[in-house]
């Protein structure tokens, strides 16, 4: 069994408490439709732009090594009436950056949004920098927002003549409310005759239950599941021109989602997450630990006095093999998640050993769930 330090024990203890909290919850919890599905077409749009950050304390791009930074600086100064063509520029306070952000759905002109600023050249840090006016473009090439402002950096970098230290990523930062929306995306929701609900986790049963909940609420068959991820809603006549009011009511309806039995395994951290619908057929599980220890203790061989011999090192290797914890447990047919965990814990199995056991049970065809390894 793999050894766990104090930090690992604490982490597993916290995971166990969380698992108990979930197991103590109702077996058939309901969720709002708002938490299960999105309105198709109501989404964010990604924006991107290229700009310059100035005001860096000598940690910017090396202009001789990064030609696009030098060209951008020259072009910007020329637009402001400063001609530096042919002049030597030696500043280290400028960095070329990419600016990204998400345009919120239904954002109107003047709405502010956050942006992320990332260095493109060899700048060591963007600490203390200010982003100059940067147009942000959508996938269609149109400008939807303009960004500018002082950066907030999550890391730092410092160096001396013989040593340096870096924490976090000092070449990446954010500007809260650093962009202003200049163009709106037209989306006439209130004039739509049909609306589609896009499920976040597609499932036939959940889609059918959502449609049934909407139809029961409206008293007419206006909702119909199209596929596992889509429910189409025909807007009733009394809500034409006021679709927002209808969707406000529908979002609050309670539905019991159905999920696929799945086990998620993160081999790097040893974390295992199992859904409540995981079932196991009859299977016997044996678990034991084989430990091989090898120790080297070289010996010195001294020659007799007044002899012509030489002092030499002779190797000595001790190999030991120990096996402990051999146990066999029978997991009965159709056991629940809690019974499975209790049974495996009875063998003294840790999280990392449990990963291999679950994969072996799946290979034997005795586990009724999908296993996804991250």
UniProtKB/Swiss-Prot annotation:
Gene Ontology CC, one term: outer membrane-bounded periplasmic space
Pfam families: FlgI
Signal peptide: 1-29
Record key words, sorted: Bacterial flagellum, Periplasm, Signal
InterPro entries: Flag_FlgI (IPR001782)
GO molecular function: structural molecule activity
Entry keyword Nucleus: no
GO annotation terms (biological process): bacterial-type flagellum-dependent cell motility
Location relative to the cell: Periplasm; Bacterial flagellum basal body
UniProt feature coiled coil, ranges: none
Bias (Polar residues): 296-311
Disordered: annotated segments: 296-316
Family in the record: Belongs to the FlgI family.
General function of this protein: Assembles around the rod to form the L-ring and probably protects the motor/basal body from shearing forces during rotation.
PANTHER family: FLAGELLAR P-RING PERIPLASMIC PROTEIN FLGI, FLAGELLAR P-RING PROTEIN
Cited NCBIfam families: PRK05303.1
Subunit structure: The basal body constitutes a major portion of the flagellar organelle and consists of four rings (L,P,S, and M) mounted on a central rod.
Name the record gives this protein: Flagellar P-ring protein
Species of the source: Nitrobacter winogradskyi (strain ATCC 25391 / DSM 10237 / CIP 104748 / NCIMB 11846 / Nb-255)
Gene that encodes the chain: flgI
């Amino acid at each position: 069994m793999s050894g766990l330090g104090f930090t690992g024990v604490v982490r597993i203890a916290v995971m166990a408490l969380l698992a108990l909290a979930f197991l103590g919850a109702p077996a058939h919890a309901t969720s709002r439709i708002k938490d299960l599905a999105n309105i198709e077409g109501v989404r964010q749009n990604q924006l991107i732009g290229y700009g310059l950050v100035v005001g860096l304390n000598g940690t910017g791009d090396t202009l001789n090594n990064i030609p696009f930074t030098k060209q951008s600086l020259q072009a910007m100064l020329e637009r402001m009436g400063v001609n530096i063509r042919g002049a030597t520029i030696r500043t280290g306070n400028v960095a070329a950056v990419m600016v990204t952000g998400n345009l919120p759905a239904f954002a109107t002109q003047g709405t502010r949004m956050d942006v992320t600023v990332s260095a493109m050249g060899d700048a060591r840090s963007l600490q203390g920098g200010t982003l100059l006016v940067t147009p942000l473009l959508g996938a269609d090439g149109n400008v939807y927002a303009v960004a500018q402002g002082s950066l907030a950096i999550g890391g730092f970098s410092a160096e001396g003549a013989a040593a340096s230290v870096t924490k976090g990523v000092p070449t990446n930062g954010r500007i809260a409310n650093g962009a202003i929306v200049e163009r709106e995306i037209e989306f006439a929701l209130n004039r739509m005759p049909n609306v589609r609900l896009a499920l976040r986790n597609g499932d036939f049963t959940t889609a059918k239950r959502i449609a049934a909940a909407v139809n029961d609420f409206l008293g007419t068959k206006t909702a119909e599941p199209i596929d596992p991820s889509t429910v189409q809603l025909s807007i009733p006549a009394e809500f034409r021109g006021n679709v927002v009011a209808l969707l406000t009511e529908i979002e609050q309806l309670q539905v019991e989602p159905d999920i696929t039995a799945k086990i998620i395994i993160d081999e790097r951290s040893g974390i295992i997450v199992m859904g409540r619908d995981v079932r196991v057929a009859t299977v016997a599980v044996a678990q034991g630990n084989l430990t091989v220890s090898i120790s080297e203790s070289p010996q010195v061989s001294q020659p007799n006095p007044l002899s012509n011999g030489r002092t030499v090192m002779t190797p000595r290797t001790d190999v030991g093999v120990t096996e402990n914890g051999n146990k066999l447990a029978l997991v009965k047919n159709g056991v629940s998640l809690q019974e499975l965990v209790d049974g495996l814990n009875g063998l003294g199995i840790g999280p990392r050993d449990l990963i291999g056991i679950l994969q072996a049970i799946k290979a034997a065809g005795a586990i009724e769930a999908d296993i996804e390894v991250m």
